[in-house]
Amino acid sequence: MELQFRELEIWQTFWTGMGAAGIWLMGVVFFIWVGFRLSGNLYANAEANVVMRIAATGFCLCVAYFALVWFAMTEWHANGVAGAFLDLKGSVQGLSPNGEMFLAGSDPRAPMSLMPNPPQGILLLCALSIQLMSIWMPKKS
């Protein structure tokens, strides 16, 4: 038995997944902010011990990894939906112009990759640089 979806069902699946991804993004942004707060407080406190600095570094690196996973999962989700649109395009039902535009801007059936695109990579590198330099650089009097 072959499953046959209508375009509206595919769009609903896409937006349901993106809603869940939005909640995950709010968590990632919150934890990036917490990383900035940690690094700022460690920079301001010259007496912070090395264990706290290592823990804060680990926290910031984990949050950066979670952001990479979020970038990858949202792209993978969109590409999976584009794969469903590609199947629908070849069926009797056909595909609407909006579905065609979505399909043209996606890479159907592409595997999940943690490699960020350039703006995502620059964003994460900037955030990590600011956080880690604040944690490990000595405060200038």
Question: Predicted segment positions?
Answer:
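Cytosolic-side membrane-entry/anchor segment at the start of a transmembrane helix
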Residues: 1-36
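Hydrophobic alpha-helical transmembrane segments
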Residues: 19-20, 94-129
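Alpha-helical transmembrane segments
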Residues: 21, 25, 29-33, 51-68, 119-122, 129-130
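Transmembrane alpha-helical segments in integral membrane proteins
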Residues: 29-40, 113-141
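Amphipathic, cytosolic membrane-interfacial segments at TM-TM junctions
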Residues: 38-55
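Hydrophobic alpha-helical membrane-insertion segments
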Residues: 54-82
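Juxtamembrane non-transmembrane "cap" segments at the membrane-aqueous interface
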Residues: 73-101
